[in-house]
């Protein structure tokens, strides 16, 4: 029999009162005896701390705190330790005789919270001779020792051979080791399990009936049926997963259209934009290249036009210069003609005016003589009138002064002043400073005499003047003629100059007669010279146009060469036209062919895409239509083979499912009828009794019982007999065995065990030999093992079946795809590649365009050469007739010579024409120039002087006369004398005034008459002089004009000038015509250059913009391509058939897809934002980001449990293959997974029945326990009424509630909860969910009610409550319950632990003084019967007769507190003896 493990000792190190104390524990009861504060509770606290080192649970309260709601602040542990390292260790020995030391290292943590640090550890392999205190202490001397810290302890143990030290970081690991080694009874997997264990220890420690345990006895006593719960959970999980998968399939089916729509629209949206950008990039590149070609061509054209413009501008400049010269010559010729005509008219006017001047000269001389006589008479009259006027004025002045003096007395002074003024004036005029009033009369006579003398002298000079006048006029006339011809000169030189002029006139007339012959000769030579110059100009222009200088002798040969070149170029131009037409015809044919190929290309590309998809799907390459049809036949054969294999795998999988279902029956029954028969017979299936058999023992028991392993064990066979009569619903062989199901063993057979077999002696004459089965199915462990292997096989079969089904579906879809391909694309798919042909044709088209361009250039050059040759021939036709003129080199010299002679002759003719008349007039009177009448001028001056002297003498006489007349004013004496004296004077003055006025009147009349006559004479003279001067001036002007004209007017001059003008006009017209042509050509050339310049600028701008756009687009395109390649979507986006659509079509396609996508992603915020960002036309990469995001979104939505791919497009293809198959398979799987409500009820009932039997067995162990009035203790287990009704409905009336269990919306747990609510509407479920309630209803423990009952005195069986029992009875009852719990835990954990391990049993009891001796004896008896260790604490008055007793006494020695311990063995049979080594000397830690 397996020995039970025991606790050997408890060691306390550095606890309060215990420095190093080891308590040896008795195999039954260990008693700690001592007074208050002796250390009993501390010792038990150390044991509990080493057993359960969980600070969240540990709480050591004193007995006085039993009614307190909260304990001490440190929960009782901190105060039980000393400073420094502390240990609590348990020394145990298990059923395998292995010594295991487990314990904890404790250490106080500084701080107000009074915390304790705990480190659990375990020591294995420690020799029995080593004491625990030796491990953790180090002796320093006889009186001192040191506690080793944990790391030193570890090092010390590692140095010992065979000793293992383990330190644990978690309490779970610590308890797991203790459970595996048999130290604790139950595996404590969680904090809840630890809490239950601690509550059990706490309940035993403080005694009594623990309400915490009695309220939850089900949790303590009834094991959790994890297998059933796990089965239900697995079933529900499988059903939930199945239904979720089915729902996912339905969602996927609904999403499939969304997937298709989203993928197709996203592909259309992004691919259209992608291909549009690709097309635009290609178009932009083509445009950039075209712009560059056009730019190069335009630059060449502009350079050619610029060269042409320079040539024409140079020629135009030459023509402009020539035109200026010709205009100047023409203007000069016109001016010369005008001058000749003007000179002729001037000459006629001069002759006419000269005749008029001669006539006027004669009349003017006559009138001069008349006027001279009239002037003399007029002067005499003027002098006489002036004298009379002066006399009258003087007399009036004198008379006026006199009247004033008479009127006013004051006028005397005025008169006196006037007299003085007259005297002064007379002094000044007469130059007589000594003149006085008295001497004025004398001087008056003198000056009157001078006046008379001057008058006589003037008259004599006047007579001399008239006589010399005639001789002087002839000399002056001759002299003026000489001055007019020769210019100013001295009078004495006039004679010599006049003779020289007359001789020169004769020579000039001889030269003037030669003007006309010279002019005619000059005109002829000038005409030839102009023709020569024109020929030279034509030759120079021809050489310039030809770009080469030619000699005169080479021109005829050149003329013939140019004519031959014209003929050959004409043939070349005609041939080039035909060649150009042929090239253009070929180009049109190529263009037509390219258009047809471009129309066929999308169809071919679609067929190729379909073919590539088929090739990718089947992994084959097709080169002809025959390959396609042959592969289609292979597909049909492959489909048939796959269907056959799929059906075989499906049949095997169904067989495995059936076997799994059969093995999964509760109780190990493979036939449901056996469960019903066992329930009917009141028995238990043999497989249920052996349900806990281990996997190693399963083959043995399976062979032992053989066919009877499915037997029913019944208590009494006789009671079954009546049920066998008429029994039909049963297996063919039904085995019944009589025995007690609670204590059944294999003693019913006589067995001999052989090698892997047994011989069963059923009877004396019947043996059965059974070999151990290779796959045992007896016992739950064997069945679970088999089920596990079957599940693995089923997974393989399911995967194979799914693979085959997928292959069949894939093959069928591939067959359909091939059929569609044959019907749609087979006719065109294997034709030649239109794109390759398009590329070849495009290259040929480029060659043709290049050939046409070269041909046009060559043809243009030929045309230019042809035109140049024609122009050269035309120019030579004008030059060749003038070759003789070009050869005449002396023509210009002869023209210059004749021109010089003509200039001399014309100069002579102009001299004769200008001075011929003057010379003719001078010739008759030239002799008068020999003597110059100079005295005429002197006489003329003397006459003027005498006139002046006569006027001065007259004024002097008049002044003296006035003085003499005012002589009376100088001597006024008084007023009377002045009045009387002046009265006579007044009368005289008046008389004289009257005489003077009469004389003045006569003089005035004579002067007036003679003045009128003189005026008439002067008018006639002035008119004649004016006419003469005018005509003379006009004649001089005409002569000067004629001289200024500088031409000699003769009869032929006008005709020669007109001919010259007409010739120059013709040349000027020709030059202007050519200039106009050049200007027009130059204007056209400039316009063409401007157009080319604008075109060039536009092309440069367009080219650079396009190039910049290409470069910018290239960067963006590179980013797009990188993003496309990184995300692997190029195959989806690069749809070549879209390359043949226009940009508008692609944009329209993208816009339509965008509108559809906006609706499709309206509910997805992420895709909506990405789609909105992708609408930016400047950021094409964002569309790729949207496409990637859409694909990622679809990938995330792909059900990986259904579809095994990341590609949404492939997912859609696989969806259509998988959905129907999965739907069918999952529906059948759900039908198989669903467990019936009757099965659930049977499982729960069987479990309840088994646990009731187990509790009944536990009650048998407590029948003999009694405490005081308590005679017996038992556990009563009943099924709750509400739950019993639920089980009845599940097993008998489940058809009425199939609406719950057949609903796909409810799990089985939820359906069970709904049924429970339906059956018990009065029960409030609170806030719990149906799933939670259903899971509770699947736990059989919730169906049971457990309570502790005691048989007390005459009251019989009563419910155990603290109020109805005494303290001792309550402690005994509680201890009984705890023992039952421990035993229940051991039974529950027997399957989890090795068969050779029987765990330690130990409980506590503090304050055992409350029990009487009989109760304590009962505890001893219970411990002995149950092999349980007990530690109790009691005062000193308790001395048990059995076990080991320690007496504890707390002492103080030298300020050091310690506990003195004395140990005693049981002393009832013999004298007590002191245990060795129990007396502890005082010590203190160093």
From Swiss-Prot:
Listed SUPFAM superfamilies: P-loop containing nucleoside triphosphate hydrolases (SSF52540)
UniProt cross-references to Gene3D superfamilies, sorted A to Z:
1.20.58.850, 3.40.1140.10, Immunoglobulin FC, subunit C, MukB, hinge domain
**Region described as Flexible hinge: spans on this chain:** 666-783
Q: Which residues of the sequence carry a binding annotation for ATP?
A: 34-41
* Ranges in coiled-coil conformation: 326-418, 444-480, 509-603, 835-923, 977-1115, 1209-1266
Q: Which GO terms describe its cellular component?
A: cytoplasm; nucleoid
Q: Which GO terms describe its biological process?
A: cell division; chromosome condensation; chromosome segregation; DNA replication
Give compartment(s): Cytoplasm, Nucleoid
Q: Name one GO molecular function term.
A: ATP binding
Note whether Membrane occurs among the keywords: no
Give the chief site where it resides: cytoplasm
Question: Which keywords does UniProt give here?
Answer: ATP-binding, Cell cycle, Cell division, Chromosome partition, Coiled coil, Cytoplasm, DNA condensation, DNA-binding, Nucleotide-binding
Q: What does this protein do?
A: Plays a central role in chromosome condensation, segregation and cell cycle progression. Functions as a homodimer, which is essential for chromosome partition. Involved in negative DNA supercoiling in vivo, and by this means organize and compact chromosomes. May achieve or facilitate chromosome segregation by condensation DNA from both sides of a centrally located replisome during cell division.
What does the record's free text say on domains?
The hinge domain, which separates the large intramolecular coiled coil regions, allows the homodimerization, forming a V-shaped homodimer.
Summarize subunit and interaction data from the UniProt record for this chain: Homodimerization via its hinge domain. Binds to DNA via its C-terminal region. Interacts, and probably forms a ternary complex, with MukE and MukF via its C-terminal region. The complex formation is stimulated by calcium or magnesium. Interacts with tubulin-related protein FtsZ.
Stored NCBIfam families: PRK04863.1
Give the family, as the similarity comment puts it.
Belongs to the SMC family. MukB subfamily.
Q: What is this protein called?
A: Chromosome partition protein MukB
Q: Which organism is it from?
A: Shigella boydii serotype 18 (strain CDC 3083-94 / BS512)
């Amino acid at each position: 029999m397996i020995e039970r493990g025991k606790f050997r000792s408890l060691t306390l190190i550095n606890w309060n009162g215990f420095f190093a104390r080891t308590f040896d524990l008795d195999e039954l009861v260990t008693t700690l005896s001592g007074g208050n504060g002796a250390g009993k509770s501390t010792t038990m606290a150390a044991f509990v701390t080493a057993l359960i080192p969980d600070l969240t649970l540990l709480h050591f309260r004193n007995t006085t705190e039993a009614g307190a709601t909260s304990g001490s602040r440190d929960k009782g542990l901190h105060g039980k330790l000393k400073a420094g390292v502390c240990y609590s260790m348990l020394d145990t020995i298990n059923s395998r005789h292995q010594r295991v030391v487990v314990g904890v290292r404790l250490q106080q943590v500084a701080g107000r919270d009074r915390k304790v640090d705990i480190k659990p550890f375990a020591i294995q392999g420690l020799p029995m001779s080593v004491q625990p205190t030796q491990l953790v202490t180090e002796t320093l001397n006889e009186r001192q020792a040191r506690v080793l810290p944990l790391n030193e302890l570890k090092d010390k143990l590692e140095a010992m051979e065979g000793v293992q030290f383990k330190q644990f970081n978690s309490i779970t690991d610590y308890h797991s080791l203790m459970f595996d080694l048999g130290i604790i009874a139950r595996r404590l997997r969680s904090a809840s399990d630890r809490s239950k264990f601690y509550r059990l220890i706490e309940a035993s420690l403080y005694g009594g009936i623990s309400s915490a345990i009695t309220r939850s006895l089900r949790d303590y006593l009834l094991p959790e049926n994890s297998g059933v719960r796990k089965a239900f959970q697995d079933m529900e999980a499988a059903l939930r997963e199945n239904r979720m998968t089915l729902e996912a399939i339905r969602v996927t089916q609904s999403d499939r259209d969304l997937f298709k729509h989203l993928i197709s629209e996203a592909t259309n949206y992004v691919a259209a934009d992608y291909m549009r950008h690709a097309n635009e990039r290609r178009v932009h590149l083509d445009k950039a290249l075209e712009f560059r070609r056009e730019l190069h061509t335009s630059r060449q054209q502009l350079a050619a036009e610029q060269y042409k413009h320079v040539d024409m501008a140079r020629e135009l400049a030459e023509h402009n210069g020539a035109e200026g010269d010709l205009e100047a010559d023409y203007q000069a010729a016109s001016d010369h003609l005008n001058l000749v005509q003007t000179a002729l008219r001037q000459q006629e006017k001069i002759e006419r005016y000269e005749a008029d001047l001669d006539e006027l000269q004669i009349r003017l001389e006559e009138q001069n003589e008349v006027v001279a006589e009239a002037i003399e008479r007029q002067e005499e009259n003027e002098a006489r009138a002036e004298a009379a006027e002066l006399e009258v004025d003087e007399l009036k002045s004198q008379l006026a002064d006199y009247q004033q003096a008479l009127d006013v007395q004051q006028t005397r002074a005025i008169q006196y002043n006037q007299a003085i003024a007259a005297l002064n004036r007379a002094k000044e005029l007469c130059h007589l400073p000594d003149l006085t009033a008295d001497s004025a009369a004398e001087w008056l006579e003198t000056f009157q005499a001078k006046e008379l003398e001057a008058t006589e002298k003037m008259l004599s000079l006047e007579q001399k003047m008239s006589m010399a006048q005639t001789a002087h006029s002839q000399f002056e006339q001759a002299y003026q003629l000489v001055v007019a011809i020769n210019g100013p000169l001295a009078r004495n030189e006039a004679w010599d100059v006049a003779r020289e002029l007359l001789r020169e006139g004769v020579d000039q007339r001889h030269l003037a007669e030669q003007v006309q012959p010279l002019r005619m000769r000059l005109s002829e030579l000038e005409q030839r010279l102009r023709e020569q110059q024109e020929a030279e100009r034509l030759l120079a222009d021809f050489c310039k146009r030809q770009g080469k200088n030619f000699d005169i002798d080479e021109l005829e040969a050149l003329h013939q060469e140019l004519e031959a070149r014209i003929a050959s170029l004409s043939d070349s131009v005609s041939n080039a036209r035909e060649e150009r037409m042929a090239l253009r015809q070929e180009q049109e044919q190529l263009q037509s062919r390219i258009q047809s190929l471009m129309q066929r290309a999308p169809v071919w590309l679609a067929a190729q895409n379909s073919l590539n998809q088929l090739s990718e799907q089947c992994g084959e390459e097709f080169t002809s239509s025959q390959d396609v049809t042959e592969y289609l036949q292979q597909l049909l054969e492959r489909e048939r083979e796959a269907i056959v294999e799929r059906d075989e795998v499906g049949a095997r999988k169904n067989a495995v499912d059936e076997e799994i279902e059969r093995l999964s029956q509760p109780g190990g029954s493979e036939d449901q009828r056996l469960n019903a028969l066992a329930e009917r017979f009141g028995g238990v299936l043999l497989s249920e009794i052996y349900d806990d058999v281990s996997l190693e023992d399963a083959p043995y028991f399976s062979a032992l019982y053989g066919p009877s392993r499915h037997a029913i064990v019944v208590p009494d066979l006789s009671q079954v007999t009546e049920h066998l009569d008429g029994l039909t619903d049963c297996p063919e062989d039904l085995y019944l065995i009589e025995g007690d199901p609670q204590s059944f063993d294999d003693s019913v057979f006589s067995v001999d065990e052989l090698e892997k077999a047994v011989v069963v002696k059923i009877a004396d004459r019947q043996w059965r030999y059974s070999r151990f089965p290779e796959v045992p199915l007896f016992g739950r462990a064997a069945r679970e093992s088999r089920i596990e292997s079957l599940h693995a096989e089923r997974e393989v079969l399911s995967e194979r079946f799914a693979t085959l089904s997928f292959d069949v579906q894939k093959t069928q879809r591939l067959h359909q795809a091939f059929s569609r391909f044959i019907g749609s694309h087979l006719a065109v798919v294997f034709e030649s590649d239109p794109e390759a042909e398009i590329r070849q044709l495009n290259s040929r088209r480029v060659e043709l365009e290049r050939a046409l361009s070269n041909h046009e250039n060559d043809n243009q050059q030929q045309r230019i050469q042809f035109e140049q040759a024609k122009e050269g021939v035309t120019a030579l036709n004008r030059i060749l007739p003038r070759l003789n003129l070009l050869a005449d080199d002396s023509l210009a010299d002869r023209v210059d010579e004749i021109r010089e002679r003509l200039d001399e002759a014309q100069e002579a003719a102009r001299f004769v024409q200008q001075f011929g008349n003057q010379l003719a007039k001078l010739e008759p009177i030239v002799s008068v120039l020999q003597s110059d009448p100079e005295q005429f001028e002197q006489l003329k001056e003397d006459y003027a002087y005498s006139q002046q002297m006569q006027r001065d003498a007259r004024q002097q006489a008049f002044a003296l006369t006035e003085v003499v007349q005012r002589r009376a004013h100088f001597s006024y004496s008084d007023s009377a004398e002045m009045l009387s004296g002046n009265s006579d004077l007044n009368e005289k003055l008046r008389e004289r005034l009257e005489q003077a006025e009469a004389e003045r009147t006569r003089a005035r009349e004579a002067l007036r008459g003679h003045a009128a006559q003189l005026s008439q004479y002067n008018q006639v003279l002035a008119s004649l002089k004016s006419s003469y001067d005018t005509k003379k001036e006009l004649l001089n002007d005409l002569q000067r004009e004629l001289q200024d004209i500088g031409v000699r007017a003769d009869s032929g001059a006008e005709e020669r000038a007109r001919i010259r003008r007409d010739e120059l006009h013709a040349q000027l017209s020709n030059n202007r015509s050519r200039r106009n042509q050049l200007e027009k050509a130059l204007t056209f050339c400039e316009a063409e250059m401007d157009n080319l310049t604008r075109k060039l600028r536009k092309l440069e701008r367009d080219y650079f913009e396009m190039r910049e756009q290409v470069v910018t687009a290239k960067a963006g395109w590179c980013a797009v391509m990188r993003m496309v390649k990184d995300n692997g979507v190029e195959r989806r986006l690069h749809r070549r058939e879209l390359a043949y659509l226009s940009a508008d079509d692609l944009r329209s396609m993208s816009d339509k897809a965008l509108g559809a996508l906006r609706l499709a992603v309206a509910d997805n915020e992420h895709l909506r934002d990405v789609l909105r960002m992708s609408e930016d036309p400047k950021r094409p990469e964002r569309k790729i980001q949207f496409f990637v995001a859409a694909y990622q979104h679809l990938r995330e939505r792909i059900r990986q449990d259904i579809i095994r791919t990341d590609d949404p497009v492939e997912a859609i293809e696989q969806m259509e293959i998988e959905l129907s198959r999965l739907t069918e398979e999952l529906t059948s799987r759900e039908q198989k997974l669903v467990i019936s409500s009757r099965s659930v009820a049977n499982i729960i009932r069987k479990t309840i029945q088994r646990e009731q039997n187990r509790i009944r067995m536990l009650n048998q162990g407590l029948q003999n326990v009694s405490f005081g009035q308590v005679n017996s203790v038992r556990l009563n287990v009943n099924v709750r009424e509400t739950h019993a009704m639920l089980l009845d409905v599940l097993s008998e009336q489940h058809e009425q509630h199939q609406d719950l269990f057949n609903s796909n919306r409810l799990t089985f747990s939820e359906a069970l909860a709904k049924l429970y609510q339906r059956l018990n509407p009065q029960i409030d479920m609170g806030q719990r969910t149906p799933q939670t309630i259903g899971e509770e209803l699947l736990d059989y423990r919730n169906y049971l009610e457990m309570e502790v009952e005691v048989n007390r005195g005459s009251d019989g069986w009563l419910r155990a409550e603290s109020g109805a029992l005494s303290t001792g009875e309550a402690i005994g009852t509680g201890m009984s319950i705890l023992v039952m719990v421990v035993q229940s835990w051991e039974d529950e954990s027997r399957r989890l632990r090795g068969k050779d391990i029987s765990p330690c049993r130990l409980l506590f009891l503090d304050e055992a003084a409350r029990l009487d001796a009989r109760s304590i004896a009962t505890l001893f008896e219970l411990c002995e019967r149950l092999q349980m260790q007990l530690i109790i604490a009691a005062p000193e008055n308790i001395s048990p007769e059995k076990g080991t007793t320690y007496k504890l006494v707390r002492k103080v020695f030298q300020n050091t507190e310690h506990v003195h311990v004395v140990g005693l063995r049981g002393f009832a049979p013999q004298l007590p003896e002191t245990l060795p080594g129990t007396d502890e000397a005082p010590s203190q830690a160093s």
